[in-house]
Amino acid sequence: MADVRYYGTGRRKHAAARVFLVAGDGKVTVNGRDISEYFGYETLIMTAKEPLVLTETEGKYDIMVTVKGGGFTGQAGAIRHGISRALLQADPDFRGTLKAKGFLTRDARMKERKKYGLKAARRAPQFSKR
């Protein structure tokens, strides 16, 4: 009998993550590499694994992630969102816990566009009185 796979899609900024959960011993693979090898920074790894720590399921699932787009911070946030959604599929009782922390909500904040006449989104050129 094949193992049951749980799936979740996560997004943050310009990053999109496809997350698969399978019963296992807690291995997290991101784009074919170990999570610590992929990110390198402990803070990003902690961000991505937050839903597992919160629901106390850290050693219960093997996680395979494919993530594209954005930078490392956006990708870590997308993985967190995807893992949360997949955990919800695995056990609907986690909804209250995950929702209270805001892990099920897509973070809609995006980079503000640059406007013409300005140097950046809001940065104006230096003003000279004379």
Swiss-Prot record:
What the entry lists under SUPFAM superfamilies is as follows:
Ribosomal protein S5 domain 2-like
- Entry protein name: Small ribosomal subunit protein uS9
Q: What's the family?
A: Belongs to the universal ribosomal protein uS9 family.
List the source organism: Exiguobacterium sibiricum (strain DSM 17290 / CCUG 55495 / CIP 109462 / JCM 13490 / 255-15)
Note the SS bond partners.
none
Annotated InterPro entries? Ribosomal_Su5_D2-typ_SF (IPR020568), Ribosomal_uS9 (IPR000754), Ribosomal_uS9_bac/plastid (IPR023035), Ribosomal_uS9_CS (IPR020574), Ribsml_uS5_D2-typ_fold_subgr (IPR014721)
Q: Which GO terms describe its biological process?
A: translation
* Pfam families reported for this sequence: Ribosomal_S9
Q: Name one GO molecular function term.
A: RNA binding
